[in-house]
Amino acid sequence: MSSFVTNGYLSVTLEPHELTLDIKTNIRNAVYKTYLHREISGKMAKKIEIREDVELPLGEIVNNSVVINVPCVITYAYYHVGDIVRGTLNIEDESNVTIQCGDLICKLSRDSGTVSFSDSKYCFFRNGNAYDNGSEVTAVLMEAQQGIESSFVFLANIVDS
């Protein structure tokens, strides 16, 4: 995983009942709820600091809500194709094999190996190596996929040990 820090404006929408004396708290909560730990366009905001030293630009009324661009210092995280990651192998059935790596989900394609069911548990076979469901494996990221809520998703292949 790689990361970078940038200054930018994050756009949030506030409802009329949120425009009270607690507006700073409501803005902070809206920014965190909308952007923090959410995968958007291949990157995820891991840390957000709202800049108090910069004035807020005027809001815009859109459909009975107020859209505000909030000045922030944002630390983003992202993964590259070719990154090597380690995680837990999760086999739900023959067609759903994933590796869970914290904020990353690696999907294994059918041609990555074969799934077998023996002794009341699933096993994944690749190049003569057997990997039990729940075992720690290493994978190389092959292709980025559409993220899910708060996770990156990549197609990956297991690296043979």
UniProtKB/Swiss-Prot annotation:
Q: Where is coiled-coil annotated?
A: none
Which reactions fall under this protein's catalytic activity? RNA(n) + a ribonucleoside 5'-triphosphate = RNA(n+1) + diphosphate
Per UniProt, the keywords (alphabetical) are: DNA-directed RNA polymerase, Early protein, Nucleotidyltransferase, Transcription, Transferase, Virion
| Cellular localisation | Virion
GO MF, one example: DNA-directed RNA polymerase activity
EC number, UniProt record: 2.7.7.6
Entry-linked Pfam families:
Pox_RNA_pol
Q: Which domain of life is it from?
A: Viruses
Disulfide bridges in this chain:
none
Statement: the UniProt record of this protein carries the keyword Ubl conjugation: no
Q: Name one GO cellular component term.
A: DNA-directed RNA polymerase complex
What does the UniProt induction comment state?
Answer: Expressed in the early phase of the viral replicative cycle.
* Gene Ontology biological process terms in this record: viral transcription
Into which family does the record put it?
Belongs to the poxviridae DNA-directed RNA polymerase 18 kDa subunit family.
This protein's assembly is summarised as: The DNA-dependent RNA polymerase used for intermediate and late genes expression consists of eight subunits Rpo30/OPG66, Rpo7/OPG90, Rpo22/OPG103, Rpo147/OPG105, Rpo18/OPG119, Rpo19/OPG131, Rpo132/OPG151 and Rpo35/OPG156. The same holoenzyme, with the addition of the transcription-specificity factor OPG109, is used for early gene expression.
Protein function: Part of the DNA-dependent RNA polymerase which catalyzes the transcription of viral DNA into RNA using the four ribonucleoside triphosphates as substrates. Responsible for the transcription of early, intermediate and late genes. DNA-dependent RNA polymerase associates with the early transcription factor (ETF), itself composed of OPG118 and OPG133, thereby allowing the early genes transcription. Late transcription, and probably also intermediate transcription, require newly synthesized RNA polymerase.
Name it. DNA-directed RNA polymerase 18 kDa subunit
The major lineage groups are: Viruses, Varidnaviria, Bamfordvirae, Nucleocytoviricota, Pokkesviricetes
What is the gene name? OPG119
